[in-house]
């Protein structure tokens, strides 16, 4: 019960400090306790062979699925391995976590890798944290698209992942379109310029992307936000704020996102912001 700390905190705060203020203070302290217990609590993994923290399970599941997707194309190439290594660098994994990630990637390449079981266990470990689960699917989509294309086997694996965490076909296709547009949009000059102006995360290597660098694409910007070209300013702003709320790094961290994954969350927020800014600039909106 992830709210037990809040309940206990309310009664203790009410007794110690008196009144509603004391109860609210107790709820806040209890919330912090619930969060820490959730982060430190171990989860059972029949696949990785030991009890893990949720953060470790997130990281190992990510690389195991990446290995499975790489194998789906027939054989794992040196490019696939290099892309996995680049992701480890982007996540700034220490030596111990790099070793775990490599082991998970190798496990995912096995012919009998139980994809649905792995994702189901991950879903259960995340509980009701839908934003965290959606972000996990996005990470897999981004990684799979790093070579500039998605074949039918890769798409089927991605849909299996999305379906297992409870997404519909429509939700999956919408998210995939948004992710692919973000990849295209990110390869354009506007995103690089925006990121450099913000002192952002362009120090990392993105050699795996093979999209054309033809500058900003307004249609991709619309797709990044999941909106139509003719939507009014208020509708665009609502979509932008909703996505920024879902991808806020601090909020994802509070729901169990590993520290190592924060860089990807920040990059996603940058993409959303850059797309919104380009739309506003094109439309002449303030």
Swiss-Prot record:
The keyword Zinc does not apply. Residues 32-286 are cytoplasmic. The chain crosses the membrane at residues 7-31. Residues 220-286 form the J domain. Gene3D superfamilies: DnaJ domain, TerB-like. Keywords: Cell inner membrane, Cell membrane, Chaperone, Membrane, Transmembrane, Transmembrane helix. It is a single-pass type III membrane protein. One of its GO terms (cellular component) is plasma membrane. Residues 1-6 are periplasmic. SUPFAM superfamilies: Chaperone J-domain (SSF46565). Its main location: membrane. It comes from the Bacteria. GO terms for molecular function: protein-folding chaperone binding. It is found in: Cell inner membrane. InterPro entries: DjlA, DjlA_DnaK_co-chaperone, DjlA_N, DnaJ_domain, J_dom_sf, TerB-like. The transmembrane domain is a dimerization domain. Homodimer. Regulatory DnaK co-chaperone. Direct interaction between DnaK and DjlA is needed for the induction of the wcaABCDE operon, involved in the synthesis of a colanic acid polysaccharide capsule, possibly through activation of the RcsB/RcsC phosphotransfer signaling pathway. The colanic acid capsule may help the bacterium survive conditions outside the host. This is Co-chaperone protein DjlA. It comes from Haemophilus ducreyi (strain 35000HP / ATCC 700724). The lineage of its organism: Bacteria, Pseudomonadati, Pseudomonadota, Gammaproteobacteria, Pasteurellales. The gene is djlA.
């Amino acid at each position: 019960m992830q709210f037990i700390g809040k309940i206990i905190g309310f009664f203790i705060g009410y007794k110690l400090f008196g009144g509603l203020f004391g109860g609210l203070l107790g709820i806040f302290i209890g919330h912090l306790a619930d969060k820490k217990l959730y982060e430190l609590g171990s989860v059972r993994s029949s696949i990785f062979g030991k009890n893990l923290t949720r953060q470790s399970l997130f990281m190992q599941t990510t690389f195991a699925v990446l290995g499975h997707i790489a194998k789906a194309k027939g054989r794992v190439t040196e490019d696939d391995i290099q892309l996995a290594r680049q992701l480890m660098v982007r996540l700034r994994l220490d030596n111990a976590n790099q070793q775990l990630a490599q082991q998970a990637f190798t496990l995912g390449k096995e012919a009998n890798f139980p994809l649905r079981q792995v994702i189901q266990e991950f879903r259960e470990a995340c509980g009701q944290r839908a934003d965290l689960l959606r972000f996990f699917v996005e990470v897999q989509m981004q990684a799979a698209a790093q070579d500039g294309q998605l074949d039918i086997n890769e798409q089927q694996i991605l849909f299996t992942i999305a379906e297992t965490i409870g997404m519909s076909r429509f939700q999956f296709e919408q998210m995939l379109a948004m992710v692919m547009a973000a990849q295209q949009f990110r390869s354009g000059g506007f995103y690089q310029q925006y990121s450099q102006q913000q002192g952002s995360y362009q120090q990392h290597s993105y050699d795996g992307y093979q999209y054309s660098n033809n500058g900003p694409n307004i249609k991709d910007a619309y797709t990044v936000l999941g909106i139509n070209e003719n939507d009014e300013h208020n509708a665009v702003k609502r979509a932008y704020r909703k996505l920024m709320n879902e991808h806020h790094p601090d909020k994802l961290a509070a729901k169990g996102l590993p520290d190592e994954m924060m860089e990807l969350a920040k990059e996603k927020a940058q993409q959303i912001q850059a797309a919104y800014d380009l739309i506003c600039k094109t439309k002449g909106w303030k």
